[in-house]
Every structure is written in structure tokens, then in C-alpha cells.
């Protein structure tokens, strides 16, 4: 059905992603590839160089932790693990989803979303931000 599917996930909220997994698998059918994407917040440019090494070490730790959790998430899928790719990036979810979509010439984004609340309506959420700025179809799973 779809060849290249991007699935933004929060590795620290597995239950939210679990809801979207079955939908992504269905869309992938027999030969589609699912690209799991976890986005870590980018650090602001630091003018205090003495802290830069500490920030880099912390970012490396976060990236390693995210990669391990993504690997664990692969076991939640029923499709062949070779059809699931993992990406960890720094930045905003919206921008990184769009960048990866462009790099991969992706067909669709599948993203889990919480049930709406007053805070997500007022402040926005990753899912709503991705929807507003994506240049490809987005399936939101609740």
C-alpha cells in the first residue's frame, strides 16, 4: 500500500506509540518500510563554552537511551524487523518529520495522539504541529 512510512514516536511514552503501530503495519502491507523517528530537543547555542562538553555528553547519553528504547519498540511490531528503520534526531518534531520525509521521499506519516484536552488545544501538540506543516498525508491514531 505505502512503501515508506514515517512514524514519529516518543520512546518515553510507549503506550502512545503502541496505538499507532498496528495502523503503520497495515499501511506497510507486504513490502513497505516503517521509519521510527524519535526527536530529542535540540540544545540552544551555548555561549558558555565551559558547559559545551557537558551538554554534548548529556546529548550523547540521551541519544543512546533513545536508540535502546527504539530497539525495544521494534519488538512490539509483528512485521519483519528488517523492514523497520530507526532514527534519532535533535530539533523540533515538526521540522525533523518534514526533513526525514523529504530525505526518504516518504508516502505517509503515522502518529499517535492523546485525546484532546484544553492544554493541547491551547498550546498545540506534536501531532497537530506535524499535521499543520507536513507536505504529505498524515494519519493520526487515537
From Swiss-Prot:
InterPro entries named among the record's database cross-references: Rossmann-like_a/b/a_fold (IPR014729), Universal_stress_UspA (IPR006015), UspA (IPR006016)
Any Pfam family matching the protein: Usp
Family annotation (NCBIfam families): PRK15456.1 (NF012000)
Family: Belongs to the universal stress protein A family.
Protein name: Universal stress protein G
Species: Escherichia coli O6:H1 (strain CFT073 / ATCC 700928 / UPEC)
